């Protein structure tokens, strides 16, 4: 790419007129795919280590929903002619059940914040992708509420200290 092409692309992006508007949407989908796959794996791990049997089923359900999100995103990527990105493995932790739930809640909040920013970036460019990501955002809110409920049931006092 020559200097003139780089300069004109810079101006297009600076003014919000990207040469390839779907490229941003694809980048968002790739990032969300990796994140949903990692979260599905993480929630499965939390469920397997959970000392509270009543929470085990709920964590497995969240993991399955995360896996379904990843499948939906994968379908969009394939439909756009893209290869699925490699998903780095999660590292295992030896934290207690309560700390795992708290970390899961923090992760859901961080992910939700990222998703809001990503949606702003592609809102008008790709309504089909925006709709999928908004659906995922709604389910993330439900997950946060469920995790918060589990935390309060496991140790209500500890949640007020965090």
Language model regions located:
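Iron-associated oxidoreductase/ferritin-like identity signal
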Residues: 1-162
